């Protein structure tokens, strides 16, 4: 088995695949097929446009437009809670929250909440981690505890007031 570099970068597909499976215990799929980290590495090297995914069984996703998401990221930087998030191209920021909690944000029309869905992951083209779901400051691999969606609410509400005020 390849030695995983720590912490993995968005471009290091092999290290990411190992972190997803070994550290986070997420099932890994490449182009829809369940794979091992080694298979994922090989498939991504052969086809850089391949899509790496997981089943979002251990978390919910909260996706918002990029402008709103950028403001949320600024707000959460001041929070004691860490919110794993990744960018989807130039259009969307997706936050990972504790499984089953995303529904508490269902009243926010700008947010798309998904539970149990297939979730594309970096290093898929166009995706990059803003805040990965592991502690980048730890001496070794350490998964972050995903926050409850209500912990994201204050930052979302603050950002929404700003965005709706400029509409």
Language-model regions: role of each:
Residues 102-141:
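Aromatic- and Lys/Arg-enriched surface recognition patch
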């Amino acid at each position: 088995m390849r030695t995983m570099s720590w912490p993995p970068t968005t471009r290091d597909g092999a290290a990411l695949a190992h972190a997803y499976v070994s550290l986070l215990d997420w099932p890994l799929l490449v182009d829809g097929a369940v794979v091992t980290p080694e298979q994922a590495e090989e498939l991504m090297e052969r086809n850089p446009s391949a899509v790496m995914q997981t089943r979002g069984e251990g978390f919910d996703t909260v996706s918002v437009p990029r402008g709103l998401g950028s403001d949320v990221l600024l707000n959460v930087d001041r929070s004691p809670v860490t919110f794993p998030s990744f960018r989807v191209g130039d259009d969307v920021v997706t936050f990972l929250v504790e499984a089953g909690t995303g529904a508490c944000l269902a009243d926010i029309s700008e947010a798309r909440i998904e539970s149990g869905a297939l979730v594309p992951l970096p290093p898929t083209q166009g995706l990059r981690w803003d805040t990965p779901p592991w502690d980048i400051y730890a001496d070794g691999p350490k998964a972050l505890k995903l926050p409850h969606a209500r912990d994201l609410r204050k930052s979302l509400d603050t950002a929404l007031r700003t965005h709706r005020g400029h509409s």
